């Protein structure tokens, strides 16, 4: 097993700005936010997507906010800028042989689960690694529960950035208190 100081986890969560019924007539962040789909919640939403890079212990290393329609793969390089961790755990949204090859050339090893119908899925999808990957889902749940991150009242980019920075700072300070 790899030492935990070499592993980081990458994932994203939706940041909706309104209820789905208002998706096509909302005016806030016009031209910046757009409509995207969240497969795990089976939900079309208007807003942004927050992509995060987190350590196994839960410390948030980096984050990027994009329009909701931006695919997870397009943000990987920006998230990994300056990352010292060499093993990156992702979900099915990062399953791409091209991305894996590109990251290996940069010195990273990307692990993503295989789809159930892919050859070798049972051997590859080790429950221990899948359990490690759940760390980021726990962090997202904490951000929602403790800081209500999915409900933003920001009405401009400066306000949104300030809110995200405050939430991440508070989360990371809380992380240091616990450890």
Walk through the language-model features, giving the residues of each:
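Short alpha-helical elements
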Residues: 1-179
């Amino acid at each position: 097993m790899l030492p935990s100081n070499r592993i980081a986890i990458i994932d994203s969560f939706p940041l909706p700005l309104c209820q789905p019924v208002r998706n096509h007539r909302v005016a806030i962040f016009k031209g910046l936010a757009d409509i995207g789909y969240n497969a795990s919640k089976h939900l079309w939403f208007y807003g942004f997507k927050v992509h995060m890079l987190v350590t196994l212990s839960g410390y948030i290393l980096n984050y990027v906010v994009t329009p909701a329609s931006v695919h997870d793969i397009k943000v990987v390089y920006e998230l990994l800028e300056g990352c010292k961790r060499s093993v990156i755990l992702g979900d099915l949204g990062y399953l791409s042989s091209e991305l894996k090859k590109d990251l290996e050339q940069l010195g990273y090893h990307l692990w993503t689960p295989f789809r159930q119908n892919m050859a070798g899925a049972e051997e590859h999808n080790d429950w221990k690694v899948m359990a490690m990957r759940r760390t980021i889902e726990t962090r997202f749940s904490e951000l929602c529960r403790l800081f209500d991150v999915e409900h933003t009242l920001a009405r401009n980019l400066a306000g949104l950035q300030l809110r995200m920075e405050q939430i991440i700072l508070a989360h990371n300070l809380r992380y240091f208190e616990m450890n």
